[in-house]
């Protein structure tokens, strides 16, 4: 498939700013290279009141491995049915841990939505990588298959990139390698220890597997990782550095050290160890922390003209991406919600969409004290339009997938647009306070959804918001 149409638009954009330079509207020093010229032209264009021309980006493929099941449609169906992925942890000893529950991927033979790693990697290959990489490989395979994109030519492979992030990466593998070094000596440390745990190797493995030779990148921004990955990948396409990007997040954090560490931060639910499916309860007065989850969410992003030229199905368009920093605390969000507010505002500005145009918000909503801060920021954003918006936290069903959370929630927002339904916030028995916003308690709500906003906020005050819109020419 030729990528000429999209690249021609970038050339047209270059010609546009070049003409502005020629007629004297821009001042560019002589003796600098093409790249520096483009950068300076872009800066001058902004000063003139415009932005560099951006190509439109659409979502054409979805892939998921989650605590609700393997596959986007299975996961989505169970989410709408109010299924919880939480259960008691049985894979390792938890008696001495404060938090003894998690949202684990259902394992099995691959039927009925269970995950069977053997369907994606040979056992020998599985031993060379951490599960977070295995999950990314599986989700990426599903997304590419869903998109019907299997580049074979040099041009198509070079025009397709990968951007998959993770918040923690191979945490358990690092601990196990430490034990091996201590107990058995350095010669027994596997040569695959490093490449099997590095976060960017999720992107690397997918790139190698599918011969994708475009931008090969990764991102690590705690719980905002998945959203940042999709947002950054959309900009890579928008700026013309690729025509297709495989993007998202992946995580496999459920192990003793992670449960102990997050509990030490007072971030995990510990009051519902005997009732795990009631533990994740965003906005509820009895919430006491998040439930750790695992899995991967991957999307295929595509330049619009490229997707149309090959007849791809289009789920939604990525029209806005905002980022901000709280500069407040290593784990807590700024108490006034200013960072979240600026992040959402930035995403809407980029999208050219007013707050009153939003139909659905997939909240960060982790079932912690920060829920109230996010709610206040959203109310400030929406103003008088709050009463027309539905906002839910799907973490009530999936738990918190950390670096993969923003990616699976972007997929949920995409499917909410496709099916005109807002997924529920489970366990919302007693809202902490009143709000005009519909928090979609317990049961999914059918309603018109043309525009969705997906929020992700992470430790260190790193924030990301994505705006998705129903595709229209």
Question: Each PLM stretch: what is its role?
Answer:
Residues 136-149, 202, 207-210, 215-251, ...:
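Active-site-proximal alpha-helical scaffold in enzymes
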Residues 59, 80-221, 250-261, 355-372:
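Conserved beta-ketoacyl condensing-enzyme motif
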Residues 183-190, 228-231, 235, 239, ...:
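Glycine-/small-residue-rich "gating" segment that lines the acyl/pantetheine channel
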Residues 143-156, 307-311, 344-360, 381-385:
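Phosphate/pyrophosphate-binding loops at sites that engage ATP/ADP/AMP, CoA/4′-phosphopantetheine
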Residues 42-125, 305-317, 411-425, 469-473:
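ACP-dependent fatty acid/polyketide chain-elongation machinery
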Residues 90, 241-288, 321-335, 363-372, ...:
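Acyl-CoA/ACP chain-elongation machinery
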């Amino acid at each position: 498939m030729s990528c000429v149409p999209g690249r021609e638009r970038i050339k047209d954009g270059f010609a546009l700013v070049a003409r502005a330079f020629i007629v004297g509207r821009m001042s560019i020093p002589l003796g600098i290279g093409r790249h520096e010229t483009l950068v300076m032209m872009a800066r001058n264009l902004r000063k003139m009141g415009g932005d560099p021309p951006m190509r439109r980006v659409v979502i054409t493929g979805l892939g998921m491995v989650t605590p609700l099941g393997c596959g986007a449609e299975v996961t989505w169906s169970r989410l709408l049915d109010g299924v919880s992925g939480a259960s008691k942890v049985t894979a390792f000893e938890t008696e001495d841990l404060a938090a003894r529950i998690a949202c684990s991927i259902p394992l099995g033979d691959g039927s009925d939505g269970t995950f069977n790693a053997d369907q994606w990697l040979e056992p020998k290959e599985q031993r060379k990588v951490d599960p977070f990489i295995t999950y990314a490989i599986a989700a990426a395979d599903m997304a590419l298959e869903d998109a019907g994109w299997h580049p074979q030519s040099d041009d198509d492979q070079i025009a397709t990139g990968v951007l998959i992030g993770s918040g923690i990466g191979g945490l358990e593998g690092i601990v196990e390698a430490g034990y091996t070094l201590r107990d058995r000596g350095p010669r027994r440390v596997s040569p695959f220890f490093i490449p099997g745990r590095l976060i960017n190797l999720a992107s690397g493995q997918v790139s190698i597997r599918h011969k994708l030779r475009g931008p090969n990148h990764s991102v690590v921004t705690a719980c905002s990782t998945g959203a940042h990955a999709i947002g950054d990948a959309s900009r890579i396409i928008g700026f013309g550095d690729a025509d297709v990007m495989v993007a998202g997040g992946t995580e496999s954090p459920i192990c003793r050290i992670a449960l102990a560490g997050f509990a030490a931060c007072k971030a995990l639910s510990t009051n519902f160890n005997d009732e795990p499916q009631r533990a994740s309860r965003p906005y509820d007065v009895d919430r006491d922390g998040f439930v750790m989850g695992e899995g991967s969410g991957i999307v295929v992003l595509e330049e619009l003209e490229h997707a149309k030229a090959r007849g791809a199905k289009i789920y939604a368009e990525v029209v806005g991406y905002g980022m901000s920093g709280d500069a407040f605390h290593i784990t807590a969000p700024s108490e006034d919600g200013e960072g979240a507010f600026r992040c959402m505002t930035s995403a809407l500005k980029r999208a050219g969409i007013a707050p009153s145009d939003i139909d659905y918000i997939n909240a960060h909503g982790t079932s912690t004290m920060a829920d109230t801060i996010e709610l206040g920021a959203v109310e400030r954003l929406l103003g008088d339009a709050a009463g027309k918006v539905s906002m839910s936290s799907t973490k009530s069903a999936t738990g918190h997938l950390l670096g993969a959370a923003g990616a699976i929630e972007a997929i949920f927002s995409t499917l909410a647009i496709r099916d005109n339904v807002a997924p529920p916030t489970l366990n919302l028995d007693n809202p902490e306070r009143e709000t005009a916003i519909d928090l979609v308690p317990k049961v999914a709500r059918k309603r018109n959804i043309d525009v969705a906003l997906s929020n992700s906020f992470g430790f260190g005050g790193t924030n990301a918001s994505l705006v998705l819109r129903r595709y229209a020419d």
